[in-house]
Amino acid sequence: MNMQTSTVMAPPAPKTLAQMQLPLAMMRDILIKSMFRMNANLVTEMSRVICLPVNVVQELVDLCRQQRLIEATGTLNANSGNEMGYQLTDQGKARAQDALKQSEYFGAMPVPLDIYREQIKRQSIRNIAITRDQLSNAMGHLILPPALLGNLGPAVGAG
């Protein structure tokens, strides 16, 4: 529909691992599974794959390096923008494969449930009243039976 909706701000991006409010082991496993499956070797690539800011991913990479799951490979080439490259160690590959046996999920880092709930509340349309004129304007480009808008209005308003 072409209706204008109120602007709802997204929750702020986390600035640290602690702000993620997720277990470190889970975040670590999602990172190494994503590196393993997507062949992501640069922090900027990892950031894009797991959908977290670069500084948070770097913090996670540093944690994995301390656990000897990831090692630095140096700068890859001129195309990497002199960004440090990383790869899984043998121990990291084994951990990634073991983690994949437990759960095939990799990619975007999950959002903590309480943050998700708060965002859903902010996006709720329960207190938004939609008039027949607004609905007609939004659906004006469609050819619909006149009675349909009367039935559709309450359904749209109910969310």
Regions from the PLM with identified roles:
Residues T5-I30:
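Short alpha-helical segments that sit at the start of domains
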Residues A147, A158-G159:
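Pre-Walker A (Motif I) flank of P-loop NTPase domains
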Residues R37-V49:
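Short acidic, hydrophobic short linear motifs in intrinsically disordered regions
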Residues L63-I128:
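Interdomain "pre-motor" coupling segment immediately N-terminal to P-loop NTPase/helicase cores
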Residues R37, R65-Q66, G157:
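The C-terminal cap of the DNA-recognition helix in HTH/winged-HTH DNA-binding domains
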Residues I30-M38:
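Short amphipathic alpha-helical elements of helix-turn-helix/winged-helix folds
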Residues K121-L149:
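Dynamic helix-loop-helix/coil hinge segments at AAA+ ATPase domain boundaries and subdomain interfaces
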